Amino acid sequence: MDLDQWISKVKDGQHLLEDELQLLCEYVKEILIEESNVQPVNSPVTVCGDIHGQFHDLMKLFQTGGHVPETNYIFMGDFVDRGYNSLEVFTILLLLKARYPANITLLRGNHESRQLTQVYGFYDECQRKYGNANAWRYCTDVFDYLTLSAIIDGTVLCVHGGLSPDIRTIDQIRVIERNCEIPHEGPFCDLMWSDPEDIETWAVSPRGAGWLFGSRVTSEFNHINNLDLVCRAHQLVQEGLKYMFQDKGLVTVWSAPNYCYRCGNVASILSFNENMEREVKFFTETEENNQMRGPRTGVPYFL
């Protein structure tokens, strides 16, 4: 495995051969299996939200925040689906994980699932680019090994979706059995699917999975676990980054600019320096993103 050569190859827009991808997936699984459900990460580190197959915009993210290993990263899931280059996105992230395991942490998102990827594009993309479903199988097997959360310097919890009524302490995340498809309900499901809302406690989620959780729930969770902040992704934010609640105890980070090649949103990444001081870096879509606009995304003039 010549990882540096493979990284150059994928950055140049080429695909790994099917057996190279298989080798890479097997190699990264061995790294991921050692990680905790709450993976400890030291500052300085930069936290990123959803990427959703927007490969050229991911390259711009690295230009904006710095390249691995000079910059350490946590990616909070949803690498695949919706965008046209999920395969390239997931491949480059796996390569960086293989090459610099201590400098990049990959969390699972609700789209790192066999079920969702068969509906929202990743399965079809693999089928189209490799002529069969093997690449999809290798990648979705890796999904089951991805960790559920990361904790920066013991004070900032990063998770894809949000909180769960079944999780009061971080220790309850540590004991979840994660090596499986995302369940339809329960604590694992909630970490992937829940959203913050301007309410006090809990409400049913319109997504049909996870919960809506409010300000009191969030501040109690932070207090019990000695956290300053919960970082999460999972929801499009037009302005790229959004703090929630009066105490700003939660932040949503969104890292896919002009999402789905038509939403017109800005993207952001959130950096923590060695003193845990925060800096937000914003970026907009690439020229390649702008050219992706197919006829199906055009807004009819009579709307």
Curated annotation (Swiss-Prot):
GO cellular component terms listed in the entry, alphabetical order: cytoplasm
E.C. no = 3.1.3.16
Subunit-structure text = Interacts with PHYA and PHYB, mostly when they are phosphorylated and in Pfr forms.
Q: Could you tell me which CDD domains the record lists for this protein?
A: MPP_PP2A_PP4_PP6
- Describe its function: Catalytic subunit of protein phosphatase 6 (PP6). Dephosphorylates phosphorylated phytochromes, with a preference toward Pfr forms. Plays a major role in the photoperiodic control of flowering time in long days by modulating phytochrome signals in flowering time control.
- Listed InterPro entries: Calcineurin-like_PHP_ApaH (IPR004843), Metallo-depent_PP-like (IPR029052), PPA2-like (IPR047129), Ser/Thr-sp_prot-phosphatase (IPR006186)
Q: Which cofactor does it need?
A: Zn(2+)
Keywords, sorted A to Z:
Cytoplasm, Hydrolase, Manganese, Metal-binding, Protein phosphatase, Zinc
From the UniProt record, list the reaction(s) this protein catalyses. Answer: O-phospho-L-seryl-[protein] + H2O = L-seryl-[protein] + phosphate; O-phospho-L-threonyl-[protein] + H2O = L-threonyl-[protein] + phosphate
Tell me which Gene Ontology terms the entry assigns under biological process: negative regulation of flower development
This entry's Gene Ontology molecular function terms read: protein serine/threonine phosphatase activity; zinc ion binding
Localization recorded for this chain is: Cytoplasm
Descriptive protein name: Phytochrome-associated serine/threonine-protein phosphatase
Cite the Pfam families for this sequence.
Answer: Metallophos
The free-text tissue note of the record is: Mostly expressed in flowers and stems.
Q: Where is the active site?
A: H111 (proton donor)
Q: Which family does it belong to?
A: Belongs to the PPP phosphatase family. PP-6 (PP-V) subfamily.
